[in-house]
Design a protein with these regions (language model features):
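Leucine-rich repeat
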Residues: 1-210
Length: 210
């Protein structure tokens, strides 16, 4: 019904809060075909658009669906998203050229061929701060070098020096002006400017929640 009655759909948000991963909604039939050519914003929650064990084929229905959405500007995934990041790497290089805002896993982000055009990036699932986490953030920001707004949350482990993650953001996120960080508990720093001058000097907005 949604496909037939809304042929010019521009914004679609399907969120399924409270559902366990095993009870995710099967939406595969909704995202196969050439409908909604003017779609600009797509937000999906705990949905199944494919299986993580699907064959990594160029012809995956959801990937084919995304590849012809030339006007898509915002793409957001939350909850349990079952499609493997290797599928996103199969997107044609000239697809999603208008995409400017992405929310989802780092693996999905770095697999997007259009990541270089992103201006806003959000990692909704908390990252556990380990020794490799700064490298992970650096890799993500190098894949999306034009990002101006970054939102990410961290789970701090006891004794970890949280300032290292700020140094990584300052180095790799050369254009970031809006930084929104959430920590599971009190981080080991208080002010950005004295500690990371090159980051604090260019930020317009900096929020730390704990």
């Amino acid at each position: 019904m949604l496909i037939r009655q809304c042929p010019d759909l521009r914004n679609l948000s399907i969120l399924t809060q409270g559902l366990e991963p095993l009870h995710s909604i099967d939406a595969r039939s909704l995202f196969s075909g050439d409908h909604w050519p003017r779609l600009r914003s797509l937000e999906l929650g705990n949905l199944r658009v494919g299986s993580a064990t699907d064959d990594d084929s160029d012809a995956h229905p959801f990937i084919s669906f995304l590849s012809i959405r030339n006007h898509l500007q915002t793409l957001r995934f939350s909850g349990d998203f079952t499609l493997s990041s290797t599928h996103f790497a199969r997107l044609p290089r000239d697809s999603l050229q208008d995409l400017r805002s992405f929310s989802g896993s780092i693996d999905h982000l770095t697999s997007l061929p259009s990541a270089k055009s992103l201006l806003s990036m959000e990692i909704p699932n908390p990252l556990i701060l380990r020794e490799v986490t700064p490298l992970t953030i650096t890799h993500a920001l190098q894949a999306a070098p034009a990002v101006r707004s970054l939102k990410v949350s961290f789970v701090l482990q006891s004794g970890y020096d949280g300032i290292g993650i700020l140094r990584s953001i300052a180095t790799a996120g050369a254009h970031i002006k809006h930084l929104d960080l959430t920590f599971s508990n009190k981080p080991s720093f208080y002010l950005v400017s004295p500690l990371i001058p090159e980051l604090g000097a260019r930020l317009i907005k900096f929020d730390v929640l704990r």
